């Protein structure tokens, strides 16, 4: 127990260290910022030598891998140009390899000043959505709210959508569709060959983590001061969680865990 708490404490404290290098990396715009969605259709690597300014909803298509190097920083604008939040959506059959390290975590955050984030830390961009082929309680497929034409669910419990390790997701939860605020990390029908380890969601407007069905396992994950639940499961999620930590605020928060087994009627 002491070892686990020490591990979580070290990771969480490291996540809130101000990294001065954020300001000095080359800035690379991702998306046009005019409301046009960006499809990634070839294998792509985001380098730690750049800071990526996310200004569109970005879709990683089937058969394509988005690799993000350790230490990379992605800053998302408040809008995609059409009053919806920028976000990264990994489609079924797509892969994200965001394999950071303890000393070089990968950071998704808001492209805002410290003053703005201090005044209102939640809901400044969308979040990360991963769609897989793992089973749902009701069978078949479904769709994440606000994401049209991108299904999740299937029959492959051992499906892999890639790796998220030593990843930080901050200040998200803005709407990606009409009245559809999203979670910091949405795992929709994601299979148990996907690695989710040492992932932190902080100051998200909606849930920290939400699993819609699927079998993905979570280890060393933290949800800090989110506006709704720390961890939320729906549609017959059957994965496992180990070393999960939630810290909730006193003014805006939901539950540490909310778990539903079937589709909502």
Regions found by a protein language model. Name each.
Residues 1-2, 19:
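Short intrinsically disordered, low-complexity coil segments enriched in acidic
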Residues 2-12:
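Bacterial N-terminal signal peptides that target proteins for export
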Residues 10-21:
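Bacterial N-terminal signal peptides
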Residues 24-265:
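Beta-strand/loop edge motif enriched in small/polar residues
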């Amino acid at each position: 127990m002491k070892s686990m708490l020490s591990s979580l404490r070290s990771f969480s404290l490291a996540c809130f260290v101000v990294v001065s290098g954020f300001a000095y990396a080359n800035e690379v715009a991702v998306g046009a910022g005019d409301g046009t969605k960006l499809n990634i259709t070839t294998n792509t690597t985001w380098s730690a030598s750049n800071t990526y300014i996310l200004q569109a909803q970005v879709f990683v298509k089937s058969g394509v891998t988005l690799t993000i190097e350790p230490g990379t920083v992605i800053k998302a604008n408040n809008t995609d140009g059409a009053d919806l939040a920028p976000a990264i959506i990994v489609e079924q059959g797509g892969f994200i390899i965001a394999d950071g390290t303890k000393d070089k975590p990968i950071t998704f955050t808001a492209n805002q000043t410290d003053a703005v984030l201090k005044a209102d830390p939640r809901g400044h961009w969308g979040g990360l959505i991963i769609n897989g082929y793992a089973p749902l309680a009701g069978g078949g497929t479904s769709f994440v709210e606000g994401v049209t034409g991108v299904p999740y669910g299937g029959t492959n419990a051992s499906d892999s959508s890639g790796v998220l390790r030593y990843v930080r997701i901050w200040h998200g939860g803005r709407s990606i569709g009409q009245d559809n605020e999203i979670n910091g990390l949405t795992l929709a029908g994601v299979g148990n060959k996907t690695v989710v380890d040492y992932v932190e969601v902080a100051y998200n407007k909606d849930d920290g983590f939400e699993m819609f069905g699927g079998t993905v396992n979570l280890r060393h994950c933290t949800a800090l001061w989110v506006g709704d639940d720390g961890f939320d499961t729906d549609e017959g999620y059957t994965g496992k969680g180990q070393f999960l930590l939630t810290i909730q605020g006193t003014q805006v928060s939901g539950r540490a865990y909310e778990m539903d087994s079937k589709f909502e009627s």
